[in-house]
């Protein structure tokens, strides 16, 4: 017989009755019933009940066992007595009559239990993560993660993709977040960077003539942490040559749909992902990450509130300054108590808004009458128009967000989610996926009074490329000044030129599931002339391309194919499939909210010798 086990703790069944067995594992629970000891022995595969009678030679040692001791148990498999079966356990129809016990590893007193719901402080759980990982739920989450990654790999290879590995030590580049820097001992004063994504490498592989790339890629970003964001994460990195945006969608949809169907435990999955333009999702849902389980749709009622006979000046004054009014329907909210409306209003103030105006509708179809604080400022036909536009009927209510467009969208989007939650309107047991398309190529930075990229600077403009290049003709001074400040002053004086630039969209897309962004992607800008032009419109000259992205920029001068890609986040996919709200529940050894590894003590101090070897002196901030 094997030194440690003939079976796992999840193997034994009725058909094994009367057979000898050897098991090894952890003492999950130990119970004393009338002098008979019951040991629930646990390993990676399951739990088996072991019984030690007082007349067994193993009984004296069994009395000394404690929770989480690691033991080897020899015994005889037998059916459980009638009435003691546990049909909830795969091994619940048998038990092992113990004849011998060997202690393989004793355990000190546990700082936290390893079964049941965990309500211990997160820092304690992370400090003793090796114990936390013994809990069934967390253990299963980590196993789910592995199976999801296996499935993603198989699905990509099934579509003819080849798996690559790209460098971990690379050059620092401005990709939206701070880099993690690694000092070079061989090149004093110089630094490597950990990759925020293998972006340039995968595009270089396409330029090198490879066709279908994928990688389960580790990524590192020195950014502020939150529940769905981590300093290090993994993504299913994908790139393809000679493809259109629709080719990317046709490739990725079966992969994501298949994984959510395979591991979603019966949840319905969107059969075909709808394409929603960025401008539309910002209007209808107030966000570029819409949760489509929520049926509420925001509508614009700026025109209705702008009429001469509307006397609600609080909104009209904002409209005159370029603001908008967004209406968020609340079906059936008329039956809610006054406190429902007051709480929403208080919540809006807590979000930095002036509040949420509202109207409650009563009456018959076609003759609805508005009630509430601002209804008296709205003529009857305006009330009817708002009700019709928002799809309201008697007993429904509508809330209003009024501010400049970006702030109104944000408030209305948050209110939509809150109202949907309060009224329990959202669907459950579903994964609602969609594509967000036609992102703006550029945005206006009001604080710095300048145009900049809104998303990925290497995306192909979604417009007539000849006209895009022609923007340079006759307006070069406005577009490419001596420095960004000069160019921005010129743009500030040329509102028409600025408007034309800000109207340009890009072949950029996001895939969203239940309000979480799973991935961003794009058709890449593979032409150096268009790349120079795109950067020039944002105030960057060619030296920026050469200095920051020189490897890729030079490569594109030697025949680059049209290509595009995407990179769904593995961690967020697993988080959704596991029904968790925090990434730390699906990562084996995560850091805490402060970016600390409490188990191994990272980040840590290093010795003066190590710093000297790296030619580094510390300049610490004053405490």
Curated annotation (Swiss-Prot):
Gene3D superfamilies: Bira Bifunctional Protein, Domain 2, GAD-like domain, Nucleic acid-binding proteins. The record marks 33, 83 as: Important for tRNA non-discrimination. The keyword Iron does not apply. Its EC number is 6.1.1.23. It is found in: Cytoplasm. Pfam families: GAD (PF02938), tRNA-synt_2 (PF00152), tRNA_anti-codon (PF01336). GO terms for biological process: aspartyl-tRNA aminoacylation. Keywords: Aminoacyl-tRNA synthetase, ATP-binding, Cytoplasm, Ligase, Nucleotide-binding, Protein biosynthesis. One of its GO terms (molecular function) is aspartate-tRNA(Asn) ligase activity. Belongs to the class-II aminoacyl-tRNA synthetase family. Type 1 subfamily. Homodimer. Aspartyl-tRNA synthetase with relaxed tRNA specificity since it is able to aspartylate not only its cognate tRNA(Asp) but also tRNA(Asn). Reaction proceeds in two steps: L-aspartate is first activated by ATP to form Asp-AMP and then transferred to the acceptor end of tRNA(Asp/Asn). This is Aspartate--tRNA(Asp/Asn) ligase. It comes from Methylocella silvestris (strain DSM 15510 / CIP 108128 / LMG 27833 / NCIMB 13906 / BL2).
